[in-house]
Structures are given as C-alpha cells and as structure tokens.
Amino acid sequence: AIGPVADLDIVNDQLTDASMIKWDCLPYDVRSPNPLGTTGFAGGNYRSVPADLHLTTLADPR
C-alpha cells in the first residue's frame, strides 16, 4: 500500500505517470520550502515528486 508514511522516492519510482495516483489527500506543497529537512518525511524527498503536483494524504492507487 502507498500511504502518508511511504518513502516518496520509492513512490516516485513506482509511478510512471502522475495520473496513476490522485494527489489530493498531504497537507504539503512540494513547491514550498521543505519544513522537515532535506530528506522530507519518512525518508522521502519532496523534490522526487513532480514539481507541478500540488499535494493536499497520498491516496492508495489500488
């Protein structure tokens, strides 16, 4: 399952098209300064997510 604690680097690797997942659920904006440090949360890196996506909780794509 892909969820809020998933490593975004792994999530990004699994997604070949941003349309595969509905990015409408994390209260973060990838275009804003990373409030949790350079590694983001749960080991992920916000910059590994397409910069044009506005994240508002990661939805499970299943």
From Swiss-Prot:
Keywords: Copper, Lignin degradation, Metal-binding, Oxidoreductase, Secreted
Subunit composition and interactions: Monomer.
Purpose: Lignin degradation and detoxification of lignin-derived products. Oxidation of a broad range of substrates including mono-, di- and polyphenols, aromatic amines and methoxy-substituted phenols accompanied by reduction of oxygen to water.
Temperature curve summary: Optimum temperature is 50 degrees Celsius. Half-life at 60 degrees Celsius is 20 minutes. Half-life at 70 degrees Celsius is 3 minutes.
Entry protein name: Laccase-C2
Record flagged with keyword Transport: no
Gene Ontology cellular component list: extracellular region
Manner of cofactor binding, per the entry note: Binds 4 Cu cations per monomer.
Reported regulation of activity: Inhibited by sodium azide.
